[in-house]
Amino acid sequence: VRVFSEPRFDAKVDLDAHLRLVPKDARCKGMFFTHLFKLAEPRMAPERLLELASVSERRFLPFHDYAMADHMRLLHATAGVTHPSSPRGEALRRIGQTIYDGILGSHAGKVLFGVLGLDTAQILAIGPKAFKLMTTNWGEVVSERIDDRTFHVHYRSMPAFLETYHVGTVEGVLAKCGVRGRVRIHVRDLANA
């Protein structure tokens, strides 16, 4: 029996524990890095943000693959920069809430999601398939429609701030579509929910 509960946005977020579980060859697209630079830019230049995150400076191209561990370091640092007075989990959630708009702003996002308009059910159904195009060789996301108003999104082998950032991504989709909803989570461990 799965018990779903409210996400704990005020709980400590252990970056190192997450990073220990990320496969060394796990990759994601450069668009996720550049999205973080845009969010942090009013407060911090990209070069300084990379330094803060201990990520080597280089050019990030939207459709090239980069180390997922570097993205997670940058995401964690960006959360502290963009929402300095919030608990880190809440800050990660807020960044997650922006990612769907960020994806829609890309060419790939327009191709994948543009035709769906504001159809929440279609977006939640297509989202996991898009995940495989935007990350490589790690993790699995599966969306399961339970009824007209309920979806279960399963994350497997994906230690990527599931209770904070990824809850925020679903909240961001709901907000974009003008749907009032509640996101609850069943956390099995850092990589599975």
Regions found by a protein language model. Give the residues of each.
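N-terminal low-complexity or simple alpha-helical regulatory segments
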Residues: 2-108
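Amphipathic interaction/junction segments at domain boundaries or subunit interfaces
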Residues: 58-165, 187
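Short terminal or interdomain "cap/linker" segment that borders an active site or interface and mediates
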Residues: 2-4, 9-15, 19, 23, ...
